[in-house]
Amino acid sequence: MSWQAYVDDHLMCEIEGNHLSAAAIIGHDGSVWAQSATFPQLKPEEVTGILNDFNEPGSLAPTGLYLGGTKYMVIQGEPGAVIRGKKGPGGVTVKKSTLALLIGIYDEPMTPGQCNMIVERLGDYLVEQGL
């Protein structure tokens, strides 16, 4: 399965009538493996900041999580595995796999729990596959 198919079929899938507003799979080096058409252009320092938070959990909390220049307030995640952010009625879930970052961005009416489920389910699968 291509990385784009993982984004299209698994991250941008429908859950209880809702969809993520944007999603991507990004390599640890910052290269985009696949993304939805609506995913923002990430800056290298944004990817570095995310990876640093996985290595040193809590490092993004004071400054916020930035994606394409949009700031998200960091909320409780799973140290070293999942970073969650909130901005108004929407937010973001970032799951780290062995080789990549899976990023899902949502807005209402999708709930944070639905976003977490979609992103983390695929992330867990990729980890199991050694990816």
Swiss-Prot record:
Protein name as it appears in the record: Profilin
Taxonomic superkingdom: Eukaryota
Q: What keywords were assigned to this record?
A: Actin-binding, Allergen, Cytoplasm, Cytoskeleton
Any one GO CC term of this protein is: cytoskeleton
Family the UniProt entry places it in: Belongs to the profilin family.
Q: Does the keyword Nucleus apply?
A: no
Q: What PANTHER family does the database record attribute to this sequence?
A: PROFILIN, PROFILIN-2
